[in-house]
Regions:
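C-terminal outer-membrane beta-barrel translocator/porin domains of Gram-negative envelope proteins
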Residues: 643, 707-713, 722-726, 741-745, ...
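Hydrophobic helix-coil surface modules that form long, contiguous segments used
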Residues: 184-191, 199-359, 385
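Outer-membrane beta-barrel "beta-signal"
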Residues: 952-955, 959, 997-1009
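Short loop/turn motifs that connect adjacent beta-strands in outer-membrane beta-barrel proteins
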Residues: 631-635, 664-665, 699-707, 731-741, ...
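Outer-membrane beta-barrel initiation region
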Residues: 544, 584-590, 601-701, 727-731, ...
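A surface-exposed beta-strand-loop module
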Residues: 59, 96-172, 247-248, 576-593
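Hydrophobic alpha-helical and helix-loop surface patches within well-folded domains
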Residues: 19-23, 34-35, 73, 256, ...
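Beta-strand-rich binding/interaction modules
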Residues: 25, 222-223, 492-493, 506-601
Length: 1009
């Protein structure tokens, strides 16, 4: 079809459609408003301001009389202290694109929309601007079936590109003109949609747009609408073979018409490349992008766009317009009628992925036009579901229709107890993470679950019928549900209620099974609050399989057999599971058979929160020498050999094991080592076993982020058994802006001095210690935060001991990659406190030293390493040089101490993958430890008992984090702690030895502030 003929037919359609729409009668239960816009704007590309006129004809097809109109003035959100700005700065997890950027906009960078004049049917009308909402008090109310003409003159300034709308993006695009004009608010059976703009979702009214845009002639425009004057414009829009006749002057006026759309968006740039493609028997595709080395994928995007439109037109329904434009814009990806804006510096997979997602919105949003502010899951979610299906088709990948990624994303949110119901207004979610899940994720999950509940064929028919029946009609969730019920023959109110109105978890369990003389008994339990039908695959000892299907009673029906999922496996349908019954008993008579394996939901289409109880025998995945990432479908265990050597402890041979379920739940760390003892003095009696076992379990009944850890450790002749309860305070636990951690630890410590290596013998008492440790930390105490510890203990069941410490640090970002940390710590303990708890400010306590895996792994190789190489265990206090031997250090271990530190850290090579792990340091510290009944028993400071003070420089390198070790670091505590440092204190107060310069060069291992 020629472009001329297409334009003629579109004009006929436009006139005919407008006539039919304007002639519709008011129907009490099935109506929608309609508008026509006639706008003329003139954009000054030097000032980034434009003047505009707008004639709006508003048709009231509702049964209500309207005495007010409401407009959105979106640009007003881009001003300091606007609601969008305040919300972005106060929310728990700000959108990184916004953050506090609006707050720092200058007068030339803000956005605004000023109404210069407004008339109702030619008469001045009273109006009021409330930030992003314009309230109009009509002179004459609009009766049902009536209309009003509003004439507006307005002035706008385009804000610096921050979110969706704006100018001069990070990729250099001049104008992304979205939410750019005074837009009439939506009105439906729920009333006016007048939420102030904070950067989230929208609700629009279908209408016809006639838009003229005048700007510098060097610019090219792309967007919504059909260009009416292509031969005056050219720039790739011209009709081939016809002469381009541009008007005189340095400006061009672009004239667009767009029938039956809910919005109008456009971009303008002076360096656009414009490529045009044609979908066979479909729309024309326009690609407008800034060509360059980082935009090469756009050359291939056109073919993918054509194929995507063809695929979706068949899968969902015909593409509803004659044009689709992919525009290189300023912010991520955003959908508008006939067009999408995407950032352009992407690889092909990313570019195709975002194009597909935004293209799908043409079906699920700009055509259906649900109220995104209330039902974002119906648009973003359905789009997300279809995106993976479409990209799999485009790239020839075999992929499941089940949105596993959405399942795992939402399960993570449930695990962190941050989920909010999907029926929450888009602006009212407490976190951006919950909003993202409630819009993008939940709708995708709805589709995945519907495919499981009623079958994939019925779901596909539902999608097609939903689009066909409800396009251009603003459907709501009930209308989608009714389509699904009609196509499936099932009752689904129960499903939509729990999926949309609650955050209930799905958790079904195989409790037990038994086989006796061919009689099979299986007990299933519903441990979660949410309901689901059950697919249960039974595998028998003779190699045969049987699918047991149990519908939910509330469905009042069953799904058809699914040969596309289960092949020829025979299906047995049992009586429905009543929602009032938490347990379901299965009894089958299968002569000569016994059960070898049972799997609940073998197709992985049910978003079960705990699949460890979905398979019997227990689903265990054993891997060799691999990091444990956590799996949804099984408990992962990784094992590897462990070998080491120490001069005093001898050879170590053993096994290291790690285990975890999804999200690091049910964490297991275990290591067992046979030690030979000193090889030079080897005796069979010296052979011993060291071990380190810990298991962490989430305590669901204690709220968010509560865990219990049980641990038993023994190495180098010292052991500890403990039970630790950790609870993060606050609604969001570990996700709080400033975390608050409360810990309670019961422990037993003991020592066998005959197995201690020499350096530990002097720092650890022989007697056993039973104790209780209580800790409370706010923030990250080693960076910015405070921590206090209270410890009570009983040594050898006789003397009582106790201690209290307080530590605080505050870190400032002085410049890029340069920080300054101010720290202080103070502690006091009873005079009877064990030796391993006593403080010397030049280094860690004996207990801390024993816990320093990296330090002992290195120093135990040879007993001379600490003295010959000046190797010490870091404690982050800045007084490390005083811990060296033979320097005459005045530091003593006491039951009281204080330290103060200033630590400057610079990472000059942050852009390099390896060198970014290096930091240069400048530090100063002072401190003192002493013995006394009370902390106030501070000793007299003199030459023989000086105050310790040090100033120096250093360099650190996080050796365990180099990329080559990324596979091994999660498996090794040694690598996790392996931070090496070289520190050179050039001033140290009060040294009393003959080798004070030896203290000026210290190699440190690990860092524990």
């Amino acid at each position: 079809m020629s472009t001329i003929l297409r334009s003629l037919l579109l004009s006929i359609f436009f006139v005919g459609f407008c006539t039919s729409v304007h002639a519709q009668e008011v129907v009490p239960n099935d109506w929608q408003q309609y508008v026509t816009y006639d706008m003329d704007i003139d954009l000054n590309v030097e000032t980034n301001r434009f003047n505009g006129t707008q004639k709006l004809v508003y048709h009231n097809y509702s049964p209500d009389t309207l005495d007010k109109l409401y407009y959105h003035l979106y640009f007003n959100a881009f001003q300091p202290n606007s609601m969008m700005d305040v919300r972005s700065r106060q929310i728990l997890d700000p959108d990184r694109r916004v953050g506090d950027r609006i707050f720092h906009l200058s007068e030339e960078e803000i956005g605004y929309q000023k109404v210069i004049s407004l008339k109702e049917n030619g008469r001045d009308v009273k109006y009021e601007v409330s930030e992003t909402i314009l309230i109009v008090e009509l002179n004459e109310p609009i009766p049902p079936g009536g209309q009003v003409t509003m004439d507006m003159v307005f002035e706008s300034q385009v804000p610096l590109q921050i979110r969706r709308s704006g100018r001069d993006s990070a990729e250099g695009i001049r104008y992304s003109m979205t939410q750019w004009y005074p837009r009439i608010a939506g009105y439906d059976r729920a009333g006016w949609s007048t939420s102030p703009y904070i950067g989230r979702e929208f609700h629009g009214t279908f209408g016809d747009f006639d838009v003229k845009i005048t700007l510098d002639s060097t610019y090219t425009i792309g967007g919504t609408g059909y260009l009416q004057n292509p031969q005056e414009i050219g720039k790739g829009y011209e009709i081939p073979g016809l002469e381009i006749k541009r008007p005189a002057g340095d400006k061009l006026t672009w004239h667009f018409k767009a029938p039956r759309v809910i919005d109008f968006a456009w971009t303008a740039h002076d360096k656009y490349t414009h490529d045009v493609y044609q979908v066979p028997n479909g729309p024309q595709v326009h690609l407008l992008y800034a060509d360059g080395p980082r935009s090469r994928a756009w050359k291939e995007l056109g073919d993918y766009t054509v194929r995507a439109i063809e695929f979706l037109s068949e899968y969902i329904g015909p593409y509803p317009y004659e044009q689709f434009s992919v525009l290189h814009g300023g912010d991520g990806g955003m959908e508008y009628p006939m067009a999408t804006l995407v950032t352009g510096h992407r690889n092909l997979n990313s570019l195709v992925g975002v194009m597909v997602h935004e293209l799908l919105h043409i079906w699920f949003q700009t055509s259906l036009a649900t109220d995104e502010s209330k039902y974002a899951w119906m648009d973003e979610g359905f789009t997300s579901y279809m995106s993976s299906i479409t990209t799999n088709h485009l790239f020839g990948r075999q992929g499941s229709t089940t949105p596993i990624g959405s399942y795992l994303g939402y399960l993570s949110l449930l695990n962190d107890e941050m989920a909010e119901p999907a029926n929450t207004h888009s602006d009212r979610y407490n976190t951006n993470r919950a909003y993202s899940a409630g819009s993008y994720t939940i709708g995708s999950i709805v589709m995945g679950h519907l495919g499981y509940i009623m079958g994939q064929d019925a779901l596909k028919r539902t999608i097609q019928r939903y689009f066909d029946e409800w396009k251009f009609r603003h459907p709501n969730p009930m209308e989608f549900r009714r389509v699904a019920e009609k196509e499936s023959g099932l009752q689904l109110e129960w499903f939509f209620d729990q999926q949309i109105n609650t955050t209930k978890k799905i958790d079904y369990s195989i409790e037990k099974y038994r086989t006796s003389n061919g009689n099979l008994q299986i007990t299933l339990a519903r441990k979660g609050e949410a309901l689901m039908p059950v697919d249960l695959l039974v595998q028998y000892n003779d190699g045969t399989r049987e699918l047991i299907y149990i519908p939910i009673h509330l469905m009042l029906g069953s799904k058809p057999e699914e040969s596309d999922i289960y092949g020829e496996t025979p299906r047995t349908t049992l009586s429905p599971w009543r929602w009032t019954d938490p347990v379901y008993e299965i009894q089958l008579n299968r002569p000569g058979k016994s059960i070898s394996e049972i799997t609940l939901d073998p197709s992985l289409r049910m978003m079960d929160a705990n699949r460890m109880n979905n398979t019997r025998p227990f689903p265990l995945d054993l891997t060799f020498a691999q990091p444990v990432r956590g799996s949804w479908n099984e408990y992962q265990v990784s094992y590897r050999p462990a070998i080491w050597y120490g001069q005093e402890s001898g050879f170590h041979f053993g096994l290291s094991t790690q285990g975890s379920y999804m999200f690091n739940n049910n964490r297991l760390d275990a290591g067992f080592m046979i030690t030979t003892g000193d090889v030079d003095q080897y005796e069979i009696s010296n052979v011993d076993v060291d071990y380190n076992i810990s298991y962490t379990h989430k305590l669901k009944h204690f709220g968010n982020a509560a865990t219990a850890e049980i641990s038993a450790r023994r190495f180098y002749g010292i052991g500890e058994e403990s039970l630790t309860l950790n609870k993060y305070i606050g609604q969001y636990g570990t996700r709080e802006p400033i975390t608050r951690l409360l810990s309670l630890k019961l422990f037993h410590q003991y020592s066998n001095n005959d197995r201690n290596i020499a350096m530990l013998q002097s720092q650890w008492d022989d007697a056993s210690v039973f104790g209780l440790k209580m800790s409370y930390a706010v923030g990250n105490p080693s960076v910015t935060g405070v921590k206090t510890d209270l410890v009570f203990g009983s040594q050898a069941r006789q003397s009582a001991a106790g201690l209290a410490t307080f530590t605080a640090n505050k870190t400032y970002d002085v410049a890029p990659n340069l920080t300054t940390r101010f720290g202080m710590s103070v502690g006091t303990g009873s005079e009877s406190m064990p030796t391993q708890w006593r403080w010397a400010v030049s280094g860690p306590t004996g207990e801390q030293l024993w816990n320093n895996t990296a330090y002992w792994a290195i120093n135990n190789i040879d007993a001379s390493i600490p003295t010959d190489l000046n190797v010490l265990a870091n404690d982050g206090g800045g007084l490390i040089g005083y811990g060296l031997m033979d320097v005459g250090s005045p530091d003593i271990a006491g039951n009281n101490y204080f330290t103060g530190t200033i630590w400057n850290t610079w990472q000059p090579f942050s852009g390099n993958r390896v060198l970014r792990l290096m930091a240069l340091e400048l530090f100063a510290a002072t401190g003192k430890s002493w013995n006394g009944t009370y902390i106030s028993d501070f000793p007299e400071i003199n030459e023989s008992n000086p105050l310790l003070a040090s100033i120096g420089t250093g360099v650190t390198f996080d050796l365990g984090s180099i990329p080559a070790l990324s596979r091994w670091k999660p498996q090794s505590k040694l690598l996790q702690e392996l931070q090496l440092s070289v520190r050179m204190p050039f001033f140290m107060n009060g040294l009393q030895g003959y080798d004070d310069w030896g203290a000026r060069f210290v190699i440190g291992v690990s860092e524990s502030f």
